[in-house]
Amino acid sequence: MTTSARTSDLTRELARARARAIAAAVPDPELPMLTLGDLGILREVTADDAGVVVWITPTYSGCPALREMSRDVAARLAAAGLGDVEVRTALSPPWSTDWITPAGRRKLAAAGIAPPGPAPKRAPGPVPITLTAAPAAVDCPACGSADTVRTAAFGATACQDLYRCQACAEPFTHVKEI
C-alpha cells in the first residue's frame, strides 16, 4: 500500500469518526434530553471521497420523528462540511429499547421519565398478535417506589405510557419496552 493510499484511508476513517460523533449528538425530537447516540438508533456511518452515508433505525414502524431526525442529521453533517450526505433507514433488525445506552437511561430518569426495563424476547420473523399480561411494575423516577399504577396506555408519543406513584403521588412518563 502506498503512502498516499494509507493517507486516503486515514482521512476517510477520520471523516467517518467525525460524522459518527456529529450524528450521534443530534437530539431526538420527541425526547430532546436524549441524543440519537443515547437512543441507539444510529446504526452505521460510512465516508468516502464523495461524502457520508448514515444509517438510522426508527424506534418503531411509522415513527413520526424519523423524517425530522434524518433532516437534522443531514443538516448537521452538511454544516460540518462533510460533502454530500445521505441518511438511510435500516428496518432490520428492528430497534429495541435494549439499545438505549446506560447514559441515555440515566438522562431519562433525571428528566423524570422512567426508563424501560428489558425488552420482551421475540422469535425472529413475523410478530404474532397476542393478548399480553398487564405491564410489569415500573419504579417511580422521583422516589424509587415500585408502588405505581399505569393511568394511560399512551403518553405524549406512542412509545410512552403514563403512570402515577402511589407513594409520592407524582405522575410520570415511562418509555415502553419494545
Regions found by a protein language model. Name each.
Residues M1-I178:
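Domain-level signature for proteins that mediate thiol-based redox and metal-cofactor handling
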